[in-house]
Amino acid sequence: MFDLPRAAPLDMADSWLTFQAEEEQGQESFSSSVNLDDSLTSLQWLQEFSILNSNEGKTPSSSGDSHGYRQLSGAPCSPLAADPACLGMPHTPGKPISSSTSRASHLGLQPMEEIDYKTNPHVKPPYSYATLICMAMQASKKTKITLSAIYNWITDNFCYFRHADPTWQNSIRHNLSLNKCFMKVPREKDEPGKGGFWKIDPQYADRLINGAMKKRRLPPVQIHPAFASAQAAASSDSKRGSAWQMSVNSESHQLLKAFEEITNEQGWNPLGEHGWNSISDGKSHKRKQPLPKRMFKAPRLSSSPMLSQEEQTELGSLKGDFDWEVIFDSSINGFNFSAFEDLEVTPPLSPVTRSVDLTVHGKHIDCPQQWYPMGQDHAVAQNSLDFDETLLATSFLQHPWEENRNDYLSNSANIEQLFDLNEAFPAELNDWSSLGSYI
């Protein structure tokens, strides 16, 4: 095992410290030799920038430049201030280049009450053209005024219109022509000059003078008295109709209540033990007794055009009292409906019958067997379409047809069966042409 000298570690430490000192000196000399560009701005302020603190007081700068302008030492309050091209430039507003900017500056500097429109050419007066026309007419103290007088008064009292585009005169003419508040007065023959006069309509004078009509508005809608009375009558009819409907509903409710009481007294309830309420309350109650079946079918009456108007109205609406004994067929079901014996019902109308005359040139033709009704019930249950076809065939047989006429009967009926031509006429007369000459 070898023994190292004690002086070796001390020498190594001294040399290490010397190396560190030389390295630090080299870095300082390098940083001093390299000149960094001051125009390169750090973007770290973007992360800390906020609109809320942008209006806070600026920190005073420690030094000024040669021009005497102040430079910000802290973070700039806007990206424009951090631009190298903007460094050293005064941040003051420049000269306005448009008339709108000058108008805004004048409006911002002067209050609205202190603006003199007669001498200020930059501010437009806050009045509508209709108001300007009304002011000119009032200032003239005359019943009528010309268009040129209106122009002169506006230019004399408002400096803005003296320097503005003359298109405002077109707006004045349009307001005079289209606004209901102004009316034109024709010039008389003995009056000198050209053109007509203008004046304020007395109907709208108060509203226009008070400033209620600064803009063109249509007159209020006036309802004619005849239409107003018609609307009042319609509203009264609707009220009467609603009252009549309420009375009808109350009467029907009373009728149903009376019927339920009568059926309960007789010991028969068609809707179960819960009565009429079991229909609406279907979830909690169930019918214990089914409804009675219909034991007969009501005959369908034909809507024949031969019925009179009174009979048709009787068919359309039920008149008289109901015969509950017939409806519920008490004789079959075995129930006693003595309470309904006093009720009467109108008997059904008998079918319309008509004697048909089937005589052609003195020869009688018997009606087919199917034309005769089998009974009263059969006649009542006949369909209206079959009855109309019967009338059509009857009217056709009453009038002789022409020689070359093709009709319903000639296409569907057999001539030999109707007239028995095989027995009465020879074989050569069975043709249509010879038949016409024979008749």
Curated annotation (Swiss-Prot):
InterPro entries: FH_FOXJ1 (IPR047512), Fork_head_dom (IPR001766), FOXJ1 (IPR047513), TF_fork_head_CS_1 (IPR018122), TF_fork_head_CS_2 (IPR030456), WH-like_DNA-bd_sf (IPR036388), WH_DNA-bd_sf (IPR036390)
Cellular localization per UniProt: Nucleus
Entry keywords, A to Z: Activator, Cilium biogenesis/degradation, DNA-binding, Nucleus, Transcription, Transcription regulation
Location of region: Disordered: 273-293
Tissues showing expression: Expressed in two independent areas of stage 10-11 embryos; in the dorsal blastopore lip (Spemann organizer) and shortly after in the ectodermal cells of the animal cap. As development proceeds, cells of the animal cap contribute to the epidermis and show a spotty pattern, which suggests expression in ciliated epidermal cells. Distribution of these cells is uniform in the trunk area of the embryo but more random in the head, being practically absent in the cement gland and olfactory placode. The spotted pattern becomes more dispersed as embryos grow in size.
Family: Belongs to the FOXJ1 family.
Name by which UniProt lists this protein: Forkhead box protein J1-A
Organism of derivation: Xenopus laevis (African clawed frog)
Name of the gene: foxj1-a
